[in-house]
């Protein structure tokens, strides 16, 4: 993931939630930002610019995101399904935007541009949900809790499993091709280095 400074992309609205809404926790049509202002809209032009500067002919790129970066990474896939990304590893997100049409964004798809998401295209992308086997502390620092997000589970391990399983169930029920994977990193907690090492192995060696 590129670095997004807090001064330019402040807080969870500007980074984790992609600056899609002025207030991502309270979405409405009146507070929907223009798509060019979304943080998610930075990635593709950045890839093009980097290729031009390096005279690089690479057709696609990979994304590894851990914790808050994993929140950004999976939502990037949701909002930019036609991006030139090859593989995404979303590691240990604190919580997810789930594929629930009856739950409002950011916890579900309702009241957002994702309401009419194309699941066929979404599930054809290569997303790996990575989580440490010991990343199961419900009192972990900065882990969000409220009555809605706790429906996803009470810790990162539960939430990762439920997010993946729910998506897989939708794919099965609609008889869609499903290219997502769920990987548990043995004996790993919320350690960034362990997560990135495993993610790199998943992308480049498997």
For each of these PLM feature ranges, what is it?
Residues 5-9, 68-71, 94-97, 133-137, ...:
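Solvent-exposed loop/turn segments at secondary-structure junctions
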Residues 70-81, 198-199:
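Short glycine-enriched nucleophile-adjacent loop
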Residues 86-170:
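The feature captures the conserved acid-bearing segment of alpha/beta-hydrolase catalytic domains
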Residues 63-65:
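Short beta-strand immediately N-terminal to the catalytic nucleophile in serine-hydrolase-like folds
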Residues 164-206:
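C-terminal catalytic histidine-bearing segment of alpha/beta-hydrolase fold enzymes
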Residues 1-60:
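Serine-hydrolase catalytic machinery in alpha/beta-hydrolase-like enzymes
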Residues 55-57, 80-83, 119-124, 175-176:
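Extracellular/periplasmic catalytic domains that process cell-envelope and extracellular macromolecules
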Residues 32-43, 103, 155-160, 192:
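Phosphate/oxyanion-binding active-site loops and adjacent basic polyanion-contact surfaces
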